[in-house]
Amino acid sequence: MYAFVRFLEDNVCYALPVSCVRDFSPRSRLDFDNQKVYAVYRGPEELGAEPESPPRAPRDWGALLLHKAQILALAEDKSDLENSVMQKKIKIPKLSLSHVEDDGEVKDYGEEDLQLRHIKRPEGRKPSEAAHKSIEAVVARLERQNGLSLGHSTCPEEVFVEASPGTEDMDSLEDAVVPRALYEELLRNYQQQQEEMRHLQQELERTRRQLVQQAKKLKEYGALVSEMKELRDLNRRLQDVLLLRLGSGPAIDLEKVKSECLEPEPELRSTFSEEANTSSYYPAPAPVMDKYILDNGKVHLGSGIWVDEEKWHQLQVTQGDSKYTKNLAVMIWGTDVLKNRSVTGVATKKKKDAIPKPPLSPHKLSIVRECLYDRIAQETVDETEIAQRLSKVNKYICEKIMDINKSCKNEERREAKYNLQ
């Protein structure tokens, strides 16, 4: 039976007879522990012998060295192991350190192994500057203790011979040099880390002060925006009062359209006609009403313009400025008015001999802008963005008028086609 083993010292795998494993007699192919460290003799071919040299018998392997190895697989024939290796069926498990350290059998390497270890150790050891410095320190200390002088009574060879018994002191000095260098390196790293930490604390304090200043500026900016909005409302109300005093109320449109004008009550109309004959008459200013108040299922948008409450709530959930503006324009003017109006009252340049349509009332356009402004102000406080979005109100209303006219023309075509049939 053959064993596929992995030597721990050089991590090389070989297929060897089970007789190469000391004190190992497997009964089957699974009778081994892959987590155990075995003592294995290496054969001559694994030691780098010449191919012509005859293989040694198992009884002659005692002269060879024992090596720590891990058994990975067992097989009846060597070719079976080779096939398993080629097919990658053999896996190398991880070996815990406890099995390597607690293996007492592997520590007995025999006298020849110990002799080789003692022979190779001095040859493989190279002197270093630290060792020379330590030897010189020991020699100097011995000279001070014994009152010796290198220039008079001793030669360098004798000094080193006398210093050789103090190898323990040399080792202690050498051990003391390494922690000192390590201590200095750690001290430098610690000082560097302290400097970096001090720098980071300064940066953190500077950032904190900047954040506090930004928070104060943002608070002041919010107060200014609120004040500006309040001033705009007061300005609009003042304009309404002035228009009423001049006799042209903002709720009176240029054309008498039922959907966009508010007729005064009969009593007020008679009062106006009676007092208009006197030279000192001024129309009484109408009470200025707050925006977005509810009354009998209506919502007040300002300047005496009321819209349906249910439609207003549906408008608040509308997505996008374009759709919001178009729906609000339909709620204020109605499709019948919009299709016969234009935003500015100027004829289009796309058609020759185009007849200009009456413009939309400016104060109602201002109401549309104010409603859109209140909506945008809830999303952002950037005045540049607000102004940019408000500048598209006329464009949105113009697009809505074009859509209404287009749908009306399509409806007329369908009716004409139906009548022809």
Curated annotation (Swiss-Prot):
Modification N6-acetyllysine, positions: 133
GO BP terms, alphabetized: negative regulation of DNA-templated transcription
Limits of the BEN domain: 302-408
Coiled-coil annotated spans: 180-243
Residues in cross-link Glycyl lysine isopeptide (Lys-Gly) (interchain with G-Cter in SUMO2): 258
UniProt xrefs under SMART domains: BEN
One GO MF term: DNA binding
Keywords in alphabetical order: Acetylation, Coiled coil, DNA-binding, Isopeptide bond, Repressor, Transcription, Transcription regulation, Ubl conjugation
One Gene Ontology cellular component: Golgi apparatus
Phosphoprotein as UniProt keyword: no
Role noted for this protein: Acts as a transcriptional repressor.
Domain remark from Swiss-Prot or TrEMBL: The BEN domain mediates DNA-binding.
Protein name from the UniProt record: BEN domain-containing protein 5
